[in-house]
Amino acid sequence: MAEQLDMGRLNLNDSQHAPQNGFNGERSAYIPPHLRGRPQGGPPPMNAAPPMMNGGGGVGGSAWGPAPGGPSPAPPARFDGPPPGQMNGGGNWANANAQAFTPRGRDGPQGGGGWGGAAPGKFDPSAYGKPGGGGGGSARGSGDGQWKDGKHVPGPSNPRVERELFGVPNDPSKQQTGINFEKYDDIPVEASGQGVPEPVTRFTNPPLDDHLLSNIELSGYKVPTPVQKYSIPIVMGGRDLMACAQTGSGKTGGFLFPILAQAFQNGPSPPPTAQAGGYGRQRKAYPTSLILAPTRELVSQIFDEARKFAYRSWVRPCVVYGGADIGSQLRQIERGCDLLVATPGRLVDLIERGRISLASIKYLVLDEADRMLDMGFEPQIRRIVEGEDMPPTAGRQTLMFSATFPRDIQMLARDFLKEYIFLSVGRVGSTSENITQKIEYVEDADKRSVLLDILHTHGAGLSLIFVETKRMADSLSDFLINQGFPATSIHGDRTQREREKALEMFRSGRCPILVATAVAARGLDIPNVTHVVNYDLPTDIDDYVHRIGRTGRAGNTGIATAFFNRGNRGVVRDLLDLLKEANQEVPSFLESIAREGSGFGGGGGRGGRGGGRGRGNAATRDVRRMGGGGGAGGFGGGGWGGAPQGGYGGGYGGAPAGGYAPPSGGAYGGGGGGGGGGGYGGGYGNPSGPGGNSWW
C-alpha cells in the first residue's frame, strides 16, 4: 500500500500550507486558490485602518482587498463614504475602481454607496400615503414619467414596451381600422341635456394633452369616432355623461382620453390628511379614477388600453378582478395605483381589507352598466358608490357607457349622475350595418352538421361560436377538434389562466375557432373576428346584439349566423325589428312564426324586470324627454310623462288612467295591458301612490 501511494516522496515542506521563510516554525492558514500568488505580507496591525474594498472582480482579484499587483491604497476616510465628486461606485463586486464600502454614505447621482440607488432623503410620514407610496421622488407610472414641480415630465421611450403595447405595423393581434371606419361620420348622433358642448372633429390640443396625443398616434388612431367626438368635450367640460354607442365604436377611448388628458394636465390629487403611514410601500391606495366593468376579461381589456394611453406618464393603471391571485394584485396596488379598473366583487373585497380608499375619486366610470345590474352586481355597486368613502355625486364626475341603456337602467342612473348629458350614437340597442346577419332555421339535432358546413365554407379568419351552457361549450369544442378543426372553449368554470390562454390562442390565430358562453360576449375587443355563430340563440335580444357585436368592429365587416327554431320564438319579434333596423334580409319563416305567436305578446324585453325593457324607443332615447310609449306588444311604457292606456304604469309623476297604481303594500299584480299581465306591481311602483313602495 505504501509503495502504491509512494509515501516516501511526499514532503510536507513543499505544500502550500508549509511555513514560509521560517515564520515561527508554524504552518500558515489555508490560502484559497484565487488568493494564491499575491504578494506576501503579515496581517495588518490590530489598530490599522480597514483595508480598501475596491474589489477586483473575478479570479484576478478579491472583492475584499486591493487588486493584484496594484499599489497599496491610501488609508480611507472613516465610514463617511467617498469624497464628493468620486461617486462612480456601484456595488463592490465587479468594479476594480469602486470606492470603499460605506454603510450609507453620501449617495451620488451615479449610484455610489452600498445601497446603489437614489438618495434616501429624510423620512416623511405623509409621503407614504401618496400615490406610489413615497419613495423619495423616484420615477413611477406606466412608463417612467413623473409629476415634478407642478408639471408632467414624461419618461424616456422604451422600444420593448412600445412593441408590447402597440405592436408593429399590420400586427394581426391588434385591431386595424376597417374599410367602413370613415362611414361612421354618417351615423346620426343625438345629445340631449342642458348646455351640450360642441363636438371635436380631430385629436388636438386643446382639449387633449400633447403627451396623450403622442400615445394616440402610436396606437394608430387617426380621427375620433362619433362617441369620442362628443364624449371628449363633455367630460373635459366637467359634465356627467350617459353614452350609448355601437359596440366596437370606441367607447373605451371615449372615457379614457378625457380622464387621462386631465390627469396629465392637473397632476395627482393630494392624499387625504389623515392616513395610516407604513414602512416601504403604502398600505392603502388612493386612486383618482375608478372604472367598473362586469367581467374579468373586460376589465383586463380596459386595463390594456389604459396602459397604452398612460405610457411614459406619471399615471399608473391597475386592474383587480376575482378568480386571480389576490396577492399579486395587492403588490401591484402597493407600487402605486392612480387609475383602477375593477370588477365590483373584488373591489368590495379590497375595500374591506383596508387596501383601497375611494376618498380621492374624481372620475367614476360604469362600463356595460346594464350588464352589471343583470349579473346581480347592483348591491355591490350601490355599496361602492353610496356606502363607502367615495365623494358624493357633486364631488365627482360619473360616466356610464354601454351599447344599450334600457329604461329602468336610465332611471337608476339618476341616483349616480347629476345633470348628465345623454349621448346616443347611431341606432343604439341595434346592430352595426357592417355586420351581415343570417338567420338559419336549424333543429337542435342538426346543429352540428350545419355548423361543420359553415366552417368549411367560411374557413378563413376567426370564428366565434356562442352556446348557452358550459357543458355545451366543452362538448362542442371537443367535437370540432375530433373533426379536425382547431378549437378551444371559454366559460365560467375554466380557471383564469385557462381563459386567458384560450383567448390568447384565439387572438393570435393559432386556434381560430373559439366556443364561448356569455362570459365572452360583452365588451371583449377581440380583433379580426370575421364570423360569429349563435349556435344557441339567447333568450334576450340585448345579449344577441352584444354577441354579434364581436365582429364588424372598428369599421370592419363581418358575418353573424344564428341557428333559429321554434324553441327561440320568445325573441322572434325583437329579432324581426332588429333585422329591419339594420337593413338585413328577413327570412319568411321568421315572419310566419311571429304571426303565430302574436296572440301571447312579444317584445317583453327582459321579463325579469317586469318587461319594461322591451325594444321600444326607451332603449335608445333619453328617458327624461319621453312621456311613455311601451315596447312593441310588451309591458313598457310609464316614465315621467305617464303610461299609455293599459300600460305598465309606475312612473315618476304618478300613474294616470290605465296605469298600474299598486294598492297598499301591493307587490305583484295586474294592470298589464298589451298581453302578459302586470310586472312587479309595487316593485317599480309609483312612489306617490297609496302605500306604494319605491324601488329606489
UniProtKB/Swiss-Prot annotation:
Segments for region (Disordered): 1-178, 597-622, 659-696
Keyword annotations of the record: ATP-binding, Cytoplasm, Helicase, Hydrolase, Initiation factor, Nucleotide-binding, Protein biosynthesis, RNA-binding
Known catalytic reactions: ATP + H2O = ADP + phosphate + H(+)
Start and end residues of each Helicase ATP-binding domain: 232-423
Cited function: ATP-binding RNA helicase involved in translation initiation. Remodels RNA in response to ADP and ATP concentrations by facilitating disruption, but also formation of RNA duplexes.
Pfam annotation, one family: DEAD
Domain of life: Eukaryota
SMART domains referenced in this protein's UniProt entry, alphabetically: DEXDc, HELICc
Enzyme Commission number(s) of this protein: 3.6.4.13
Domain notes: The Q motif is unique to and characteristic of the DEAD box family of RNA helicases and controls ATP binding and hydrolysis.
Gene assigned in the entry: DED1
Domain Helicase C-terminal: from-to ranges: 434-594
An MF annotation (GO) of this entry: ATP binding
InterPro entries: DEAD/DEAH_box_helicase_dom (IPR011545), Helicase_ATP-bd (IPR014001), Helicase_C-like (IPR001650), P-loop_NTPase (IPR027417), RNA-helicase_DEAD-box_CS (IPR000629), RNA_helicase_DEAD_Q_motif (IPR014014)
Identification of the protein by name: ATP-dependent RNA helicase DED1
Top EC category: hydrolase
Bias (Polar residues) ranges: 12-23
Motif stretch (DEAD box): 367-370
Coiled-coil portions: none
Comp. bias (Pro residues): 68-85
Family label: Belongs to the DEAD box helicase family. DDX3/DED1 subfamily.
PANTHER family referenced in this protein's UniProt entry, alphabetically: ATP-DEPENDENT RNA HELICASE DBP3 (PTHR47958)
Comp. bias intervals (Gly residues): 54-63, 108-119, 130-144, 598-615, 666-696
Binding site for ATP: A245, Q246, T247, G248, S249, G250, K251, T252
Segments carrying motif Q motif: 201-229
Organism whose genome encodes this protein: Phaeosphaeria nodorum (strain SN15 / ATCC MYA-4574 / FGSC 10173) (Glume blotch fungus)
GO CC, one annotated term: nucleus
